A protein has these predicted regions:
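A structured, charge-rich N-terminal accessory region that forms the first stable segment of a protein
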Residues: 1-58, 64
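Conserved pre-motif C helix in the palm subdomain of viral-like polymerases
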Residues: 70-100, 192-220
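Active-site-proximal segment of RNA-dependent polymerases
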Residues: 2, 85, 89-146
Length: 425
Protein backbone atom coordinates (compact mmCIF):
# COMPACT_ATOMS: atom_id res chain seq x y z
CA UNK A 1 0.00 0.00 0.00
CA UNK A 2 1.37 3.41 -0.95
CA UNK A 3 2.08 5.70 1.99
CA UNK A 4 1.63 9.27 0.75
CA UNK A 5 3.00 10.75 3.98
CA UNK A 6 6.24 8.78 3.80
CA UNK A 7 6.58 9.39 0.06
CA UNK A 8 6.02 13.12 0.50
CA UNK A 9 8.67 13.26 3.22
CA UNK A 10 11.32 12.07 0.77
CA UNK A 11 10.62 14.36 -2.18
CA UNK A 12 13.91 15.80 -3.45
CA UNK A 13 12.77 19.44 -3.30
CA UNK A 14 11.69 18.96 0.30
CA UNK A 15 15.14 17.72 1.30
CA UNK A 16 16.79 20.64 -0.49
CA UNK A 17 14.63 23.06 1.49
CA UNK A 18 15.24 21.12 4.69
CA UNK A 19 19.02 21.25 4.35
CA UNK A 20 18.94 24.98 3.62
CA UNK A 21 16.65 25.62 6.60
CA UNK A 22 18.65 23.34 8.90
CA UNK A 23 21.86 25.19 8.03
CA UNK A 24 20.25 28.47 9.09
CA UNK A 25 19.22 26.84 12.40
CA UNK A 26 22.81 25.88 13.16
CA UNK A 27 22.57 22.12 12.67
CA UNK A 28 26.02 20.56 12.27
CA UNK A 29 27.23 20.85 8.67
CA UNK A 30 28.74 17.37 8.82
CA UNK A 31 25.28 15.94 9.44
CA UNK A 32 23.86 17.98 6.56
CA UNK A 33 26.61 16.78 4.21
CA UNK A 34 25.70 13.19 5.07
CA UNK A 35 22.05 13.88 4.34
CA UNK A 36 22.97 15.12 0.88
CA UNK A 37 23.97 11.55 0.00
CA UNK A 38 21.19 9.50 -1.67
CA UNK A 39 22.24 6.32 0.11
CA UNK A 40 21.86 8.01 3.52
CA UNK A 41 18.37 9.27 2.69
CA UNK A 42 17.43 5.81 1.39
CA UNK A 43 18.63 4.24 4.63
CA UNK A 44 16.49 6.67 6.67
CA UNK A 45 13.49 5.93 4.44
CA UNK A 46 13.89 2.16 4.87
CA UNK A 47 14.41 2.48 8.61
CA UNK A 48 11.16 4.44 9.02
CA UNK A 49 9.22 2.15 6.67
CA UNK A 50 10.41 -0.98 8.47
CA UNK A 51 9.95 0.61 11.91
CA UNK A 52 13.61 0.18 12.78
CA UNK A 53 14.20 3.73 13.97
CA UNK A 54 13.50 5.64 17.18
CA UNK A 55 14.26 9.21 18.15
CA UNK A 56 16.85 9.71 20.88
CA UNK A 57 15.75 11.32 24.18
CA UNK A 58 15.58 15.10 23.89
CA UNK A 59 17.63 17.59 25.89
CA UNK A 60 15.87 20.22 28.00
CA UNK A 61 16.86 23.80 27.28
CA UNK A 62 15.57 27.16 28.45
CA UNK A 63 14.90 30.10 26.16
CA UNK A 64 13.89 33.59 27.34
CA UNK A 65 10.29 34.77 27.00
CA UNK A 66 9.30 38.34 26.13
CA UNK A 67 8.87 39.05 29.85
CA UNK A 68 12.33 39.73 31.37
CA UNK A 69 13.44 37.00 33.77
CA UNK A 70 10.94 34.41 32.48
CA UNK A 71 12.07 31.33 30.57
CA UNK A 72 10.34 28.64 28.53
CA UNK A 73 11.53 25.02 28.71
CA UNK A 74 11.92 23.38 25.30
CA UNK A 75 13.05 19.92 24.25
CA UNK A 76 15.85 19.80 21.69
CA UNK A 77 16.54 16.60 19.79
CA UNK A 78 19.67 15.27 18.11
CA UNK A 79 20.54 16.79 14.74
CA UNK A 80 19.26 13.94 12.55
CA UNK A 81 16.11 13.60 14.67
CA UNK A 82 15.39 17.33 14.33
CA UNK A 83 15.63 17.09 10.54
CA UNK A 84 13.26 14.12 10.33
CA UNK A 85 10.81 15.75 12.75
CA UNK A 86 10.83 18.92 10.65
CA UNK A 87 10.02 16.88 7.52
CA UNK A 88 7.13 15.13 9.26
CA UNK A 89 5.72 18.40 10.60
CA UNK A 90 5.84 20.16 7.22
CA UNK A 91 4.11 17.23 5.52
CA UNK A 92 1.38 17.02 8.16
CA UNK A 93 0.49 20.68 7.66
CA UNK A 94 0.44 20.20 3.87
CA UNK A 95 -1.52 16.94 3.79
CA UNK A 96 -4.06 17.69 6.52
CA UNK A 97 -4.84 21.44 6.57
CA UNK A 98 -8.46 20.63 7.48
CA UNK A 99 -7.27 19.45 10.91
CA UNK A 100 -6.30 23.03 11.78
CA UNK A 101 -9.29 25.31 12.34
CA UNK A 102 -9.28 28.58 10.32
CA UNK A 103 -9.35 30.60 13.55
CA UNK A 104 -6.00 29.07 14.62
CA UNK A 105 -3.21 31.15 13.08
CA UNK A 106 0.01 29.67 14.48
CA UNK A 107 2.96 27.93 12.80
CA UNK A 108 1.53 27.78 9.28
CA UNK A 109 3.75 28.63 6.31
CA UNK A 110 2.55 31.62 4.33
CA UNK A 111 -0.12 32.57 6.87
CA UNK A 112 0.62 36.16 7.83
CA UNK A 113 -0.92 37.69 10.93
CA UNK A 114 -1.60 41.06 9.31
CA UNK A 115 -5.00 40.15 7.89
CA UNK A 116 -6.14 38.85 11.28
CA UNK A 117 -4.94 41.96 13.10
CA UNK A 118 -6.67 44.29 10.63
CA UNK A 119 -9.90 42.28 10.88
CA UNK A 120 -9.75 42.51 14.67
CA UNK A 121 -9.09 46.26 14.54
CA UNK A 122 -12.11 46.82 12.30
CA UNK A 123 -14.35 44.98 14.78
CA UNK A 124 -12.88 46.91 17.72
CA UNK A 125 -13.56 50.20 15.94
CA UNK A 126 -17.27 49.34 15.77
CA UNK A 127 -17.54 48.01 19.33
CA UNK A 128 -19.18 50.56 21.63
CA UNK A 129 -19.21 48.73 24.99
CA UNK A 130 -16.63 49.65 27.62
CA UNK A 131 -15.43 46.04 27.85
CA UNK A 132 -14.64 44.78 24.36
CA UNK A 133 -13.19 41.33 24.96
CA UNK A 134 -10.85 38.92 26.71
CA UNK A 135 -7.27 37.96 26.01
CA UNK A 136 -6.30 34.62 27.56
CA UNK A 137 -3.33 32.30 27.86
CA UNK A 138 -3.18 28.59 28.60
CA UNK A 139 -1.18 27.58 31.67
CA UNK A 140 1.88 25.61 30.48
CA UNK A 141 -0.08 24.44 27.43
CA UNK A 142 2.78 22.52 25.80
CA UNK A 143 3.65 20.67 29.00
CA UNK A 144 0.24 19.53 30.26
CA UNK A 145 -1.82 18.31 27.28
CA UNK A 146 -2.79 14.76 28.18
CA UNK A 147 -1.38 11.80 26.27
CA UNK A 148 -4.79 10.55 25.12
CA UNK A 149 -5.36 13.78 23.18
CA UNK A 150 -2.00 13.40 21.44
CA UNK A 151 -2.58 9.74 20.60
CA UNK A 152 -6.01 10.62 19.21
CA UNK A 153 -4.36 12.94 16.68
CA UNK A 154 -2.07 10.13 15.50
CA UNK A 155 -5.10 7.82 15.17
CA UNK A 156 -6.97 10.34 13.02
CA UNK A 157 -3.99 10.87 10.71
CA UNK A 158 -3.50 7.13 10.34
CA UNK A 159 -7.15 6.69 9.38
CA UNK A 160 -6.96 9.56 6.87
CA UNK A 161 -3.94 7.86 5.27
CA UNK A 162 -6.00 4.68 4.84
CA UNK A 163 -4.13 2.51 7.35
CA UNK A 164 -5.54 0.29 10.07
CA UNK A 165 -4.78 1.41 13.60
CA UNK A 166 -1.12 1.10 14.63
CA UNK A 167 0.07 0.02 11.16
CA UNK A 168 1.32 3.28 9.63
CA UNK A 169 5.10 3.54 10.25
CA UNK A 170 5.43 7.32 10.71
CA UNK A 171 2.60 7.42 13.25
CA UNK A 172 4.09 4.41 15.02
CA UNK A 173 7.39 6.28 15.24
CA UNK A 174 5.56 9.22 16.82
CA UNK A 175 3.65 6.93 19.19
CA UNK A 176 6.94 5.46 20.41
CA UNK A 177 8.33 8.96 20.87
CA UNK A 178 5.40 10.32 22.89
CA UNK A 179 5.10 7.18 25.00
CA UNK A 180 8.76 7.46 26.00
CA UNK A 181 9.20 9.97 28.82
CA UNK A 182 13.00 9.79 29.03
CA UNK A 183 14.68 13.20 28.65
CA UNK A 184 17.99 14.80 29.59
CA UNK A 185 17.45 17.54 32.17
CA UNK A 186 19.24 20.90 32.25
CA UNK A 187 22.20 19.27 34.05
CA UNK A 188 22.51 16.50 31.47
CA UNK A 189 20.99 13.79 33.66
CA UNK A 190 18.69 11.24 32.02
CA UNK A 191 15.36 11.45 33.85
CA UNK A 192 11.77 10.32 33.30
CA UNK A 193 9.25 13.15 32.97
CA UNK A 194 6.00 13.62 31.08
CA UNK A 195 6.61 16.34 28.50
CA UNK A 196 3.20 16.95 26.89
CA UNK A 197 3.33 18.30 23.35
CA UNK A 198 7.11 18.85 23.66
CA UNK A 199 7.78 22.37 22.53
CA UNK A 200 11.04 22.28 20.58
CA UNK A 201 10.08 19.12 18.73
CA UNK A 202 8.91 20.38 15.33
CA UNK A 203 5.87 18.08 15.35
CA UNK A 204 4.72 19.86 18.49
CA UNK A 205 3.72 22.78 16.25
CA UNK A 206 1.15 20.66 14.40
CA UNK A 207 -0.09 19.09 17.63
CA UNK A 208 -0.47 22.48 19.32
CA UNK A 209 -2.70 23.65 16.48
CA UNK A 210 -4.92 20.59 15.97
CA UNK A 211 -5.53 19.34 19.52
CA UNK A 212 -7.79 22.28 20.41
CA UNK A 213 -9.84 22.19 17.20
CA UNK A 214 -12.99 21.68 19.31
CA UNK A 215 -12.30 24.91 21.21
CA UNK A 216 -11.56 26.88 18.05
CA UNK A 217 -14.71 25.64 16.35
CA UNK A 218 -17.02 26.36 19.29
CA UNK A 219 -15.63 29.81 20.09
CA UNK A 220 -15.52 31.03 16.49
CA UNK A 221 -19.16 30.03 15.94
CA UNK A 222 -20.46 31.59 19.16
CA UNK A 223 -18.55 34.87 19.32
CA UNK A 224 -18.17 37.87 17.01
CA UNK A 225 -14.41 37.35 16.80
CA UNK A 226 -12.14 34.62 18.14
CA UNK A 227 -8.54 33.85 17.28
CA UNK A 228 -5.89 31.53 18.72
CA UNK A 229 -2.16 31.63 18.19
CA UNK A 230 -0.79 28.51 19.88
CA UNK A 231 -1.51 29.17 23.58
CA UNK A 232 -2.73 32.78 23.23
CA UNK A 233 -6.40 33.53 22.50
CA UNK A 234 -8.49 36.63 22.00
CA UNK A 235 -12.29 36.75 22.07
CA UNK A 236 -14.44 39.81 21.40
CA UNK A 237 -17.39 39.82 23.81
CA UNK A 238 -18.51 42.13 26.61
CA UNK A 239 -18.99 39.35 29.20
CA UNK A 240 -15.55 38.00 30.23
CA UNK A 241 -17.00 35.47 32.68
CA UNK A 242 -19.02 33.81 29.92
CA UNK A 243 -15.96 33.58 27.67
CA UNK A 244 -13.76 32.13 30.41
CA UNK A 245 -16.43 29.59 31.41
CA UNK A 246 -16.88 28.41 27.82
CA UNK A 247 -13.14 28.00 27.35
CA UNK A 248 -12.60 26.12 30.60
CA UNK A 249 -15.48 23.73 29.87
CA UNK A 250 -13.72 22.60 26.69
CA UNK A 251 -9.99 22.76 27.44
CA UNK A 252 -10.29 20.78 30.68
CA UNK A 253 -11.00 17.70 28.53
CA UNK A 254 -7.44 17.93 27.24
CA UNK A 255 -5.74 18.54 30.58
CA UNK A 256 -5.41 22.26 29.85
CA UNK A 257 -6.42 25.26 31.98
CA UNK A 258 -6.28 29.04 31.65
CA UNK A 259 -3.47 30.91 33.38
CA UNK A 260 -5.38 33.23 35.76
CA UNK A 261 -2.46 35.66 35.87
CA UNK A 262 -2.65 36.14 32.10
CA UNK A 263 -6.38 36.55 31.60
CA UNK A 264 -6.70 40.17 30.49
CA UNK A 265 -9.99 42.05 30.16
CA UNK A 266 -9.81 44.36 27.15
CA UNK A 267 -11.26 47.86 27.36
CA UNK A 268 -12.32 50.09 24.48
CA UNK A 269 -9.92 52.93 25.30
CA UNK A 270 -6.85 50.91 26.29
CA UNK A 271 -4.01 49.51 24.19
CA UNK A 272 -3.35 45.77 24.24
CA UNK A 273 -0.84 43.48 22.53
CA UNK A 274 -1.73 40.70 20.11
CA UNK A 275 0.30 38.87 17.43
CA UNK A 276 3.19 41.31 17.70
CA UNK A 277 1.08 44.46 17.44
CA UNK A 278 -0.50 46.93 19.85
CA UNK A 279 -4.17 47.66 19.15
CA UNK A 280 -6.78 50.14 20.33
CA UNK A 281 -9.94 50.64 18.32
CA UNK A 282 -8.94 51.21 14.71
CA UNK A 283 -5.32 52.00 15.66
CA UNK A 284 -2.55 49.46 15.04
CA UNK A 285 1.13 49.87 15.86
CA UNK A 286 4.12 47.71 16.79
CA UNK A 287 4.31 45.91 20.13
CA UNK A 288 7.08 46.71 22.59
CA UNK A 289 9.08 43.60 21.68
CA UNK A 290 8.94 44.43 17.96
CA UNK A 291 10.03 48.00 18.64
CA UNK A 292 13.08 46.76 20.55
CA UNK A 293 13.82 44.25 17.79
CA UNK A 294 13.60 47.04 15.21
CA UNK A 295 16.04 49.15 17.22
CA UNK A 296 18.53 46.28 17.51
CA UNK A 297 18.36 45.46 13.80
CA UNK A 298 18.93 49.07 12.74
CA UNK A 299 21.73 49.61 15.26
CA UNK A 300 23.45 46.38 14.16
CA UNK A 301 23.65 47.76 10.62
CA UNK A 302 24.80 51.25 11.63
CA UNK A 303 26.20 52.57 14.90
CA UNK A 304 27.18 49.16 16.33
CA UNK A 305 29.65 48.60 13.47
CA UNK A 306 32.98 50.27 14.15
CA UNK A 307 34.30 52.51 11.36
CA UNK A 308 31.35 51.81 9.09
CA UNK A 309 31.06 54.23 6.17
CA UNK A 310 27.84 56.22 5.69
CA UNK A 311 27.29 54.60 2.29
CA UNK A 312 27.62 51.06 3.64
CA UNK A 313 25.31 51.87 6.56
CA UNK A 314 22.72 53.26 4.15
CA UNK A 315 22.90 50.18 1.93
CA UNK A 316 22.50 47.84 4.90
CA UNK A 317 19.55 49.80 6.30
CA UNK A 318 17.81 49.89 2.91
CA UNK A 319 18.40 46.15 2.55
CA UNK A 320 16.85 45.40 5.94
CA UNK A 321 13.95 47.84 5.76
CA UNK A 322 12.94 47.69 2.13
CA UNK A 323 14.77 45.14 -0.02
CA UNK A 324 14.73 42.01 2.14
CA UNK A 325 14.97 38.82 0.11
CA UNK A 326 13.34 40.39 -2.93
CA UNK A 327 9.82 39.44 -1.90
CA UNK A 328 9.55 40.00 1.85
CA UNK A 329 11.15 42.66 4.01
CA UNK A 330 10.51 44.49 7.26
CA UNK A 331 8.45 47.07 5.37
CA UNK A 332 6.27 44.61 3.45
CA UNK A 333 5.47 42.67 6.63
CA UNK A 334 4.66 45.70 8.78
CA UNK A 335 3.77 48.85 6.85
CA UNK A 336 0.52 47.61 5.25
CA UNK A 337 -0.76 46.90 8.77
CA UNK A 338 0.30 49.67 11.16
CA UNK A 339 -1.51 52.99 10.85
CA UNK A 340 -0.37 55.16 13.78
CA UNK A 341 1.38 57.95 11.87
CA UNK A 342 3.24 59.40 14.84
CA UNK A 343 4.79 56.01 15.59
CA UNK A 344 5.81 55.55 11.95
CA UNK A 345 7.51 58.95 12.04
CA UNK A 346 9.27 58.12 15.34
CA UNK A 347 10.69 54.92 13.85
CA UNK A 348 11.88 56.87 10.83
CA UNK A 349 13.45 59.54 13.03
CA UNK A 350 15.49 56.88 14.81
CA UNK A 351 16.71 55.37 11.53
CA UNK A 352 17.83 58.78 10.27
CA UNK A 353 19.61 59.54 13.55
CA UNK A 354 21.52 56.24 13.23
CA UNK A 355 22.54 57.09 9.66
CA UNK A 356 23.64 60.61 10.66
CA UNK A 357 25.71 59.15 13.50
CA UNK A 358 27.62 57.07 10.95
CA UNK A 359 28.68 60.32 9.27
CA UNK A 360 29.63 62.25 12.42
CA UNK A 361 30.96 59.24 14.39
CA UNK A 362 29.01 60.55 17.40
CA UNK A 363 26.85 57.60 18.37
CA UNK A 364 25.15 58.53 21.64
CA UNK A 365 21.71 58.91 20.12
CA UNK A 366 19.38 57.17 22.58
CA UNK A 367 16.86 54.54 21.58
CA UNK A 368 13.19 53.64 21.31
CA UNK A 369 10.60 52.73 23.92
CA UNK A 370 6.95 51.73 24.05
CA UNK A 371 4.18 52.81 26.44
CA UNK A 372 0.46 52.12 26.66
CA UNK A 373 -0.82 55.30 28.33
CA UNK A 374 -0.91 57.65 25.32
CA UNK A 375 -4.06 58.40 23.35
CA UNK A 376 -2.82 58.18 19.77
CA UNK A 377 0.71 56.75 19.86
CA UNK A 378 2.84 54.27 21.82
CA UNK A 379 6.45 54.60 20.59
CA UNK A 380 8.76 57.04 22.38
CA UNK A 381 12.12 58.39 21.27
CA UNK A 382 14.77 58.66 23.96
CA UNK A 383 17.28 61.12 22.52
CA UNK A 384 20.95 60.92 23.46
CA UNK A 385 23.34 63.83 23.86
CA UNK A 386 24.67 63.68 20.27
CA UNK A 387 21.33 63.86 18.46
CA UNK A 388 20.95 67.65 18.18
CA UNK A 389 24.58 68.19 17.17
CA UNK A 390 24.40 65.41 14.58
CA UNK A 391 21.28 66.91 13.05
CA UNK A 392 22.87 70.35 12.87
CA UNK A 393 26.01 69.00 11.18
CA UNK A 394 24.22 66.98 8.49
CA UNK A 395 21.65 67.64 5.78
CA UNK A 396 17.98 67.38 6.67
CA UNK A 397 17.49 64.82 3.90
CA UNK A 398 19.78 61.81 3.51
CA UNK A 399 20.67 61.12 -0.11
CA UNK A 400 19.55 57.61 -1.10
CA UNK A 401 17.20 57.13 1.85
CA UNK A 402 13.42 57.20 1.47
CA UNK A 403 11.41 57.68 4.65
CA UNK A 404 9.32 54.91 6.16
CA UNK A 405 6.19 57.03 5.65
CA UNK A 406 7.05 57.45 1.97
CA UNK A 407 7.50 53.71 1.49
CA UNK A 408 4.31 52.99 3.42
CA UNK A 409 2.36 55.29 1.09
CA UNK A 410 3.91 53.50 -1.89
CA UNK A 411 2.89 50.09 -0.55
CA UNK A 412 -0.64 51.25 0.15
CA UNK A 413 -0.90 52.71 -3.34
CA UNK A 414 0.32 49.65 -5.22
CA UNK A 415 3.01 47.02 -4.68
CA UNK A 416 4.48 47.80 -8.13
CA UNK A 417 5.10 51.41 -7.04
CA UNK A 418 6.98 50.19 -3.97
CA UNK A 419 9.03 47.71 -6.02
CA UNK A 420 10.01 50.46 -8.46
CA UNK A 421 11.30 52.65 -5.62
CA UNK A 422 13.27 49.71 -4.17
CA UNK A 423 14.91 48.99 -7.53
CA UNK A 424 16.12 52.60 -7.67
CA UNK A 425 17.95 52.35 -4.33
Amino acid sequence: MQNKLLEKMFEMSRWENLIEKADLKGIDKGVLRQMCKPEVRLAIYQAIKNEQIEFMPSHMAQIPKDTPGEYRTVFVGENVDRCIQSLINDCLFELFPEMVHPSCKSYQVGLGTGKTVKELSTILAHTTTEIVGVKSDFHHYFDVVNLDAIMAVFDVIEEKLGFAKCTEPVMNLLRKTWNNNLVFDLDGNLIEQYCGIRQGNAIGSFLADVILYELDDFMSKKYKFYCRYSDDCITIHNNPDEVICDMNNIICKYGVSLNPKKVQILYRNEWFKFLGFNLKGNQITLSKSRVKSFQKEVEARTIKQRNITPRRALNQVNSYLYKGDGQYSWATSVLPIINVEKDVDTLNEFVMDCLRACSTKKTKIGGLGSVNDKEDYTILRGTGKNVTANRNKTDKEIDGYLSIRCMQNALLTRRAVYDTLVRCM
